[in-house]
Amino acid sequence: MLQVHQFPCLTDNYGFLLHDPASGETAAIDTPDGAEYLRQAQAKGWRITQIWNTHWHPDHAGGNAAIVAATGARVTGPEEVTRIAPLDRVVAHGDVVTLGDWRAAVIDVSGHTNGHVAYHLPEAGIAFVGDSVFALGCGRMFEGTPRQFWDSLSRIKTLPPETVLYCAHEYTAANARFARHADPDNAELAAYAREIDAKRTAGEATVPTRLSRELATNPFLRADDATLQARWGGGDAVATFAALRAAKDAF
């Protein structure tokens, strides 16, 4: 069975090590802090053999060089990562990467950046989504368009609802405040927000999250909901997503 080791790094990033006991392989999912990844792997008794980058930002690929120098790990990611680090394999939507006998489908989730990808392991029921979607939020739209980003979120929405989403940042408390503003009559969201407050007060992580919960509470994944559309200008899903994203940027 695959093992996921999650740990905090930098200011608000999460690091992830994905380990396959059968093959002994370990993938670093993004590399916010190469030294911390190496420390975490050593503490687990694992050797990092692969790196899977989701996008090019330094808090996701900036640790590649340190890990490769220490381990010789093979680096996989979208072409845009070559802006700051070399890749052994360039991947895009529809490609498959493997860890031992486990297969991960590469999904185009562009919008935060133009080449952003996610890695979905259907047999394990997990997906590493980088900065495309967060618990109760989504990434800032630095490079993409509202249509592009909504199409990406729509692809995530089609995954099995029980899929566990590993998001790259602990932004959930702030996201919950905006979500309650955006969708104040959502009772399930209100309950989720109370749970988040309790977890953060106790110093607990709110990541990972489950897609089924996000489909019911995350306003950015619900831009196709008629009630939310009426509240945010009466437009279609793309227009509603754009309005929500602009409002969150200014919130």
Predicted regions and their residues:
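Conserved beta-strand hairpin/beta-sheet module of binuclear metal-dependent hydrolase folds
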Residues: M1-K44, A118-G130
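Active-site HxH/HxHxD metal-binding segment of metal-dependent hydrolases
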Residues: T11, T26, D33-D108, G125, ...
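Core dinuclear metal-dependent hydrolase active-site scaffold
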Residues: L17, V96-P122, I126-A127, T158
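Divalent metal-coordination and catalytic microenvironments
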Residues: L18, D30, H55, I67, ...
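Active-site metal-binding loops of divalent metal-dependent hydrolases
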Residues: T31-P32, W56, E80-V81, H112-T113, ...
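Anionic-ligand binding patches
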Residues: L121, V129, P161-T172
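Active-site-adjacent loop/tail segments of enzyme domains
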Residues: G137-T163
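Accessory terminal helices/loops
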Residues: S154-V164, A173-F251
